[in-house]
From Swiss-Prot:
The lineage of its organism: Eukaryota, Fungi, Dikarya, Ascomycota, Pezizomycotina. The keyword GTP-binding does not apply. GO terms for biological process: chitin catabolic process; polysaccharide catabolic process. This is Endochitinase 37. PANTHER family: ENDOCHITINASE. Induction: Specifically induced by chitin. Its EC number is 3.2.1.14. One of its GO terms (cellular component) is extracellular region. Its main location: secreted. It catalyses: Random endo-hydrolysis of N-acetyl-beta-D-glucosaminide (1->4)-beta-linkages in chitin and chitodextrins. Residues 38-337 form the GH18 domain. The active site is at E160. It is found in: Secreted.
Length: 337
């Protein structure tokens, strides 16, 4: 048994080399600009969701695994860095339970095979203290070297805690100002074609049509800034995990074609808050959906996703999903459809 195990471990580098490339691959590669065509964007989990029982059957996988592209994904959101209380960003093996990050060479290999790779900042459990400009500056100073070393093509803002509006659309709250400080601070130090996407929950966007303040609509002035200045690639609003408001105070259940189209049309036509209108045209929308039942509330079957997509006759930029790993655990029925 010992000899068999030893032989197996000796074969692992050969197998890995055959499947995913070699350790001699280049460790630096150019920043890729915004994809010209349609995108299928998925979150790549840097932890093992199979080992912890969340989605058995497909856990952690190399970011350069060709099965990702084979099932349609051409934009990858690497989720998530650990952010310490002082704002220090970490991106390394073991920074959290079962976490393993891709090496710079593996990132280049995935990019050479067609992927555009963004770092997703935030998530439900990886927030940042937006009340402090000192914390914001510490985050900028520690995340930028990581973005450069690991050959990221952009950042995805997935902040889900700590962002609140001031109550006046024309006046930024401290947290809004500090999130803009972070985004501007990162973009200023990266190449001009470095990307920016955002993945807010609906409450932070269309929820502002009901009342503007606290979390409700708190992304709106930030979205407007980066739509207007041309730096936002697209918006990945999350069409899941709760009912969704339209532009007129109307409400729709997640997981329905009606809710999908109401949200999408609302963004395209514009949300007017206190006399200020925020628009996100169809070609800057990449709506977010759960890849599988269990990945998030409001799951839509492939047939329903197809109906929603076809309704726009190709006008949307693409679709986003949580997550690549969830999709792989259920035979890729999101990506393949």
């Amino acid at each position: 048994m010992t000899r068999l195990l030893d032989a197996s471990f000796l074969l692992l580098p050969v197998i890995a080399s055959t499947l995913f490339g070699t350790a001699s691959a280049q460790s630096t590669c150019a920043t890729k600009g915004k994809p010209a065509g349609k995108v299928l964007q998925g979150y790549w989990e840097n932890w093992d969701g199979s080992a912890n029982g969340v989605h058995p059957g497909f856990g952690w996988t190399p970011i350069e695994n060709p099965v990702i592209a084979q099932n349609g994904y051409n934009v990858i959101n690497a989720a998530f860095p650990v952010i310490l209380s002082d704002g220090t960003a970490l991106w390394e093996d073991g920074m959290d339970a079962t976490v393993k990050v891709a090496t710079p060479a593996e990132m280049c290999q995935a990019k050479a095979a067609g992927a555009t790779i963004l770092m997703s900042i935030g998530g439900a459990t990886a927030g940042i203290d937006l009340s402090s400009s000192t914390v914001a500056d510490k985050f900028i100073s520690t995340i930028v070297p990581i973005l450069k070393q690991y050959n990221f093509d952009g950042i995805d803002i997935d902040i889900e805690t700590g962002l609140v509006g001031s109550g006046s659309i024309g006046t930024l709250s401290t947290s809004q100002a500090n999130l803009i400080r972070i985004i501007d601070g990162v973009l200023a130090q990266m190449p001009a074609n470095f990307g920016l996407t955002m993945a807010p929950e609906t409450a932070y966007v269309t929820g502002g049509s009901v009342v503007y303040g606290s979390i409700w609509g708190s992304y709106l002035p930030i979205i407007k800034k980066y739509v207007d200045n041309g730096r936002l690639w697209w918006l990945n609003m999350q069409y899941y995990n709760g009912d969704m408001y339209g532009c007129s105070g109307d409400s729709y259940a997640a997981g329905t074609v009606q809710g999908f189209t109401a949200q999408t049309d609302c963004l395209n036509n514009g949300i007017t808050i206190q006399g200020t209108t925020i628009k996100v045209p169809y070609n800057m929308q990449v709506p977010g959906l759960p890849a599988q039942s269990g990945a998030g509330g409001g799951y839509m079957t492939p047939a329903l996703v197809g109906q929603a997509w076809d309704h726009y006759n190709g006008a949307l930029k693409g679709l986003m999903t949580w997550s690549i790993n969830w999709d792989g655990s259920k035979n890729w029925t999101f990506g393949d459809n």
